[in-house]
Amino acid sequence: MDPYKNRPSSAFNSPFWTTNSGAPIWNNNSSLTVGSRGPILLEDYHLVEKLANFDRERIPERVVHARGASAKGFFEVTHDISHLTCADFLRAPGVQTPLIVRFSTVIHERGSPETLRDPRGFAVKFYTREGNFDLVGNNFPVFFVRDGLKFPDMVHALKPNPKSHIQENWRILDFFSHHPESLHMFSFLFDDVGIPQDYRHMDGFGVNTYTLINKAGKAVYVKFHWKTTCGEKCLLDDEAIRVGGSNHSHATQDLYDSIAAGNYPEWKLYIQTLDPENEDRLDFDPLDVTKTWPEDVLPLQPVGRMVLNKNIDNFFAENEQLAFCPAIIVPGVYYSDDKLLQTRIFSYADTQRHRLGPNYLQLPANSPKCAHHNNHHDGFMNFMHRDEEVNYFPSRYDPVRHAERVPVPPRTLGGKREKCMIEKENNFKQPGERYRSWPSDRQERFVRRWVDALSDPRVTHEIRSIWISYWSQADRSLGQKIASHLNLKPSI
Amino acid sequence: MDPYKHRPSSAFNSPFWTTNSGAPIWNNNSSLTVGARGPILLEDYHLVEKLANFDRERIPERVVHARGASAKGFFEVTHDISHLTCADFLRAPGVQTPVIVRFSTVIHERGSPETLRDPRGFAVKFYTREGNFDLVGNNLPVFFVRDGMKFPDMVHALKPNPKNHIQENWRILDFFSHFPESLHMFTFLFDDLGVPQDYRHMDGFGVNTYTLINKAGKAVYVKFHWKTTSGIKCLLEEEAIKVGGANHSHATQDLHDSIAAGNYPEWKLFVQTIDPEHEDKFDFDPLDVTKTWPEDIIPLQPVGRLVLNKNIDNFFAENEQLAFCPAIVVPGVYYSDDKMLQTRIFSYADSQRHRLGPNYLQLPANAPKCAHHNNHHEGFMNFIHRDEEVNYFPSRYDPVRHAERFPIPPAICSGRREKCGIEKENNFKQPGERYRSWAPDRQDRFARRWVDALSDPRVTHEIRSVWISYWSQADRSLGQKIASHLSTRPNI
């Protein structure tokens, strides 16, 4: 008898109820009592097992991106970029790779409306022949802060007040008033794109700068872009109240129903690349996650397409237990020194170990679909089958060897230990350009949202003045407009 | 140096940032990198500690009642019931006991709108001189099922579909079509009361039948009622969409803002009592949680008042970590053989051990405020200070003794091991009476909500017929009304 053969699964259902040890249950309606009306006996093991499992159904939600929906499909290469990367899954046009995607909101809890003004997560796990590749991004191309050391405090400011549990603008505007690097992100969040219509009608971005490396070891910086073929659509504030008030899961339902109806959402993948030798020629730092790369100088190059054509079988197994991590890459793709990405490499796996346990990468949705081998598997809920006697390395009894060497970025690292900001901050140019690119009604809505936020009675005169100063530095007329609505004089 | 003196607290804040071991942090903005733009060093312990704590901020939400708000105040006895109970906190009019209360919705997740049609939790923890007393009830006086064996499946049916994560009527109406005992609960849930305006404008109930015992050992069955002095107010469907769409935390905010403004919500406590000698004289079983006790025969007796006059200091400590359990009673209050209550005695503590750890009753919000003593404290996160050498019982070195004996119900339990339903089900009378007591517009709204639910395209003809038959048995005109809207003929 092989204990690993009949793994627990819907495929091995008995036609009658049983306990988890397989004992038959002849009455699943009534507890075991003293007589028909007396108290329940402790020996009612079936009842205790049923309740104890139920009592433990919830695991910690994600500290961010708790609310989300997932779906499966494939990625297909449409354009050859093998001169840029040796990644196997990108080796030639026509190559398809299975994947799972999770869309999410960021700040609020599981169950929160999917109509809140918030970035949307856009995380893709490619099950490649060289192991999984997680491209863990958002629907906005930039981020609030450029060093992950600020991330926990940033999230605390955006989350509900720890006393009242209400999200409050004075806390958000206080925190970010110390970090003008956030202006560019706010030019997305407070724009109409701050509330996407649903998960199908939005673009995605890798957000951070990554590195592509080809077989010869040549590295280029890269940014990833997913463009929806459904068109970008957003909800204005009044629509969001009605949609979210009627169904707080409208985007989850939209994704599921679309796929069930055979209306498969699709995104095109594009990249922008930058030779590290040219990185000093820009007026911004290409490792600064608060910047976009101008598409007229660094054009979008098509790579492939992603189609979501299959709904998940079970929400808990393939959404709640689905774990992404930007550290999970494949040969031919590497990190950059982007300080936000560097911290993400640590945090994601760390938080999944808390949520799911040390063996979370064994869970079906997370495990690689290629052959793999190491000695990291004992501990809570190891359900892997291994029959080796040698579980150490190196050994003269075990022929397993190192994999073939994969190229890593060749640049020499040098410098003192530093805790400092980057030099080329350039916080105001891109948000100003973005604002000026809009028609006047879109500018008006943006201004109104800022006026609303700054009108929180607990926002002080000092904080209001700082923000007016910041927006004036991005665009003089924008700062003046906000100030005049608030009856304040801009400080510069 | 006493390691138990300076417990971590806002009261011992340093004026500058430190790590959790107390080391000063001289730069909380930037990670430790190789040069100004290089990768982050593993030795940046401060960064790793900050991220690792952040990564673990969430704990499992409650499997039910995840979404809620809490507040503190006091309970004051206004009427003497010391002839019914020897409970110290009920000993005489004028006696005040500090309390913490948690209101909640039941089915949806932590961030879900507080405008959904759902029962509302109403849980009160009394910090008495004889230990804590948890009265863990709801805003509706009855419950869906009368044996807790059905509870996990019931919640699964009410929760979102495990595939698409959307709450669906066909699953709810399928499950409950097997249990007509749920009809009475549905006359509350699908009534206007199903969406309270907020937590202040609703009543509360102990729901289950408990036992009061006086000094002489005489026991009476008891039901607890909390009557709001603010008046009961509900949201109709259109209002709920607007309120919940505009603020998914409106009830949390209302409770917090009311108390902050000095507008303290208040409830009066009433009891109904039945002498167990008379329990066979009714056409229902008084241990059946799907029944109310008619107030014309068993009148409400006033006991005291509950005033909430203080907001919590911290949402995580006093809401997320706040743990209730109906097993937590004081001398003079006891359980009954109500099969729902019997299972709750096990489940609540079991679930909190999963969520919070084995020492959850040491957490400040959960710990008794009276002197207490036992040997149950080691294990994860034991932070109690104990300096005894004898941590076993009995001992000739330790003078600790048994407490004074307090009375428990004197009834003799006898009977065979049984797994069965109760005899006097009487599922249709009370729901029918309740329906007939309403004005016609309220009856219409109730019928319309049933027609909407039964119109789910996945509700089969069989399920529709079962429900029409059930409602016809409660009230013939109600069944006909639903049937005619659905163009289905009633079966009886």
Swiss-Prot record, chain A:
Instruction: Please provide the record's keywords in A-Z order.
Output: Glyoxysome, Heme, Hydrogen peroxide, Iron, Metal-binding, Oxidoreductase, Peroxidase, Peroxisome
Could you state one GO cellular component term attached to this entry?
peroxisome
Alphabetical list of CDD domains matching this protein: catalase_clade_1
Stretches assigned to coiled coil? none
Set out the biological process GO terms recorded for this chain's protein: hydrogen peroxide catabolic process; response to hydrogen peroxide
| Intracellular or extracellular location(s) | Peroxisome; Glyoxysome
The record's InterPro entries line, in alphabetical order, gives:
Catalase, Catalase_AS, Catalase_clade1/3, Catalase_core, Catalase_haem_BS, Catalase_immune_responsive, Catalase_sf
Residues that span the membrane, as ranges: none
Q: Which SMART domains match?
A: Catalase
Domain of life, per lineage = Eukaryota
Where do the annotations place heme binding? 348
Active site, UniProt feature: 65, 138
E.C. number, please?
1.11.1.6
| Family under the similarity heading | Belongs to the catalase family.
Subunit organization = Homotetramer.
Role: Occurs in almost all aerobically respiring organisms and serves to protect cells from the toxic effects of hydrogen peroxide.
Put simply, this protein is called Catalase-3
Question: What is the native source organism of this protein?
Answer: Glycine max
| Gene behind this protein | CAT3
UniProtKB/Swiss-Prot annotation, chain B:
The record ties this protein, via Pfam families, to: Catalase, Catalase-rel
> What are the annotated GO cellular component locations?
cytoplasm; glyoxysome; peroxisome; plasma membrane
- UniProt-annotated binding residues for heme: 348
Q: Which InterPro entries would you find in this protein's record?
A: Catalase, Catalase_AS, Catalase_clade1/3, Catalase_core, Catalase_haem_BS, Catalase_immune_responsive, Catalase_sf
User: Keywords assigned by UniProt?
Assistant: Glyoxysome, Heme, Hydrogen peroxide, Iron, Metal-binding, Oxidoreductase, Peroxidase, Peroxisome
Q: SUPFAM superfamilies this protein is in? A: Heme-dependent catalase-like (SSF56634)
Localization recorded for this chain is: Peroxisome; Glyoxysome
Q: Which reaction does it catalyse?
A: 2 H2O2 = O2 + 2 H2O
Disulphide bond pairs: none
Q: Which residues form the active site?
A: 65, 138
Q: How does it assemble?
A: Homotetramer.
**Protein name per Swiss-Prot or TrEMBL:** Catalase-4
Protein source organism: Glycine max
The major lineage groups are:
Eukaryota, Viridiplantae, Streptophyta, Embryophyta, Tracheophyta
